[in-house]
Amino acid sequence: MKSRAAVAFAPGKPLEIVEIDVAPPKKGEVLIKVTHTGVCHTDAFTLSGDDPEGVFPVVLGHEGAGVVVEVGEGVTSVKPGDHVIPLYTEXCGECEFCRSGKTNLCVAVRETQGKGLMPDGTTRFSYNGQPLYHYMGCSTFSEYTVVAEVSLAKINPEANHEHVCLLGCGVTTGIGAVHNTAKVQPGDSVAVFGLGAIGLAVVQGARQAKAGRIIAIDTNPKKFELARRFGATDCINPNDYDKPIKDVLLDINKWGIDHTFECIGNVNVMRAALESAHRGWGQSVIIGVAGSGQEISTRPFQLVTGRVWKGSAFGGVKGRSQLPGMVEDAMKGDIDLEPFVTHTMSLDEINDAFDLMHEGKSIRTVIRY
């Protein structure tokens, strides 16, 4: 079938709006009509050429919502007409990782997904007879996409797709990191480095967890109003100080902050976040994705004296079983999604959405099909 899509033909170049061909779903696959998709920093990261798994030409997009159109052989968990959110972190329930109960990092389709292919090692997308790669198992920058069954969460059909599409990545990642990875407790102190969608979601999650002091940190003070709305008690612009941000935080509490979250992908900030964590028990959670080949460093004594360095992917959330409940929470108002959507646009305007992101003028732009 034909589908309008925003295709990245090469790194560092604007997306091109073209009509592509989408092949029918094969065994274990599902064809979806995407209704809405967020434009995420991860899409921009891959488009920049810095992503070690980036392949081109590719249909980007991984933060979407849509409706099932057709199912392939053997698909039983969804049917045509079901409302779904595609998952870049699949959940088969059968692999060693899923059976362990210790992680949300399923490996059922990970190997082929990282190569931009469907589980059988081929692609369902083509343009003028030439294959196009998939992206993170989702490719929501196409009006129609094909996704593995294990990479779909079935959701309440009454949910507002313009808002709940954000649960496909950024908001779930931030809120989940608070509850599942850090396990923030009432009264704990929290510092959030970077106030994009993920960082703001961490702030909201910290408020849900009844954290005591919630410190929001960003060099763009325009982010502070929304951070306070979500629950920040303090907002800090590192550029306002003539000393490292670590020292600013240690002035607040000389022993450090209970939980710090790096939501940028800057290895220097990752170190600062760890070294701002509380001596004896503080933990720092890395959420941001650093560029290809970059490494983190610190003095081992930082860990010897009780600090813990952790990472979090998709907030530790198991998408197929847990994401539908988060959609219900959003519908009840327990998760506030609307403020994240600062702009809505058509697919034809998608490059403007990337410009707004790079200029720091948006939190999330949602594309409506």
UniProtKB/Swiss-Prot annotation:
**According to the UniProt record, what class of enzyme is this?**
oxidoreductase
The subcellular localization recorded is: Cytoplasm
Positions bound to Zn(2+) 2: C92, C95, C98, C106
Instruction: Tell me which residues bind Zn(2+) 1.
Output: C40, H62, C169
The Enzyme Commission number assigned here is: 1.1.1.284, 1.1.1.1, 1.1.1.-
What does the record give under GO molecular function?
A: alcohol dehydrogenase (NAD+) activity; S-(hydroxymethyl)glutathione dehydrogenase (NAD+) activity; S-(hydroxymethyl)glutathione dehydrogenase (NADP+) activity; S-nitrosoglutathione reductase (NADH) activity; zinc ion binding
Q: Supply the alphabetized keyword list.
A: Cytoplasm, Metal-binding, NAD, Oxidoreductase, Zinc
Main localization of the protein?
cytoplasm
Q: Which cofactor does it need?
A: Zn(2+)
What is the catalytic activity of this protein?
Answer: S-(hydroxymethyl)glutathione + NADP(+) = S-formylglutathione + NADPH + H(+); S-(hydroxymethyl)glutathione + NAD(+) = S-formylglutathione + NADH + H(+); a primary alcohol + NAD(+) = an aldehyde + NADH + H(+); a secondary alcohol + NAD(+) = a ketone + NADH + H(+)
Task: Give the cofactor note.
Answer: Binds 2 Zn(2+) ions per subunit.
GO cellular component assignments: cytosol
From the record, give the cysteines joined by S-S bonds: none
Q: Which PROSITE patterns match?
A: ADH_ZINC
Domain of life of the organism encoding this protein? Bacteria
What the entry lists under Pfam families is as follows:
ADH_N, ADH_zinc_N
Identify its protein family: Belongs to the zinc-containing alcohol dehydrogenase family. Class-III subfamily.
Q: Describe its partners and assembly state.
A: Homodimer.
Biological function = Has high formaldehyde dehydrogenase activity in the presence of glutathione and catalyzes the oxidation of normal alcohols in a reaction that is not GSH-dependent. In addition, hemithiolacetals other than those formed from GSH, including omega-thiol fatty acids, also are substrates. Also acts as a S-nitroso-glutathione reductase by catalyzing the NADH-dependent reduction of S-nitrosoglutathione.
Q: NCBIfam families, per this entry?
A: adh_III_F_hyde
Identification of the protein by name: S-(hydroxymethyl)glutathione dehydrogenase
Protein's gene: frmA
